[in-house]
Amino acid sequence: MAITKIHPIKSTLNLAISYIVNGEKTDEQILVSTHKCHQETAHTQFLRTRNDAGTNGTVLARHLIQSFLPGEASPEIAHQIGLELCKKILKDEYEFVLSTHIDKGHIHNHIIFNNVNMVTGKCYQSNKKSYHQIRYQSDKLCKENNLSDKTV
């Protein structure tokens, strides 16, 4: 099973996105996908959605990391699992940038998604319940793809 972590991004959103799409980490950006935004302008698109919704909380985005055991998944399978996780958790209602990093001993996904829902204008509620839902969906996708039941 993959390990998942999530934390808020309260500043330097552009730097966080630049880090996750770094070509040295993502096989020259082959392993980068976006939803309702473009990787170069995602930070401004996130802020535009936020402004349009009239939201002024401190959290700009959420950074979700999904790490796989060494050798457990190919970069392509890991990336596909990340896309499916986004679909299950974010339901096409949040802009996101997904990248799969292959530069470490283990493959891992970085998902940065807007804290503001494009449909409702409400902020993502990050709490134990939402984290357990992320974990549940990630574990389910790993099982569906015949990945290990061990954790990183």
Per-segment meaning from a language model:
Residues 1-152:
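N-terminal nicking endonuclease/strand-transfer module with a His-rich metal-binding environment
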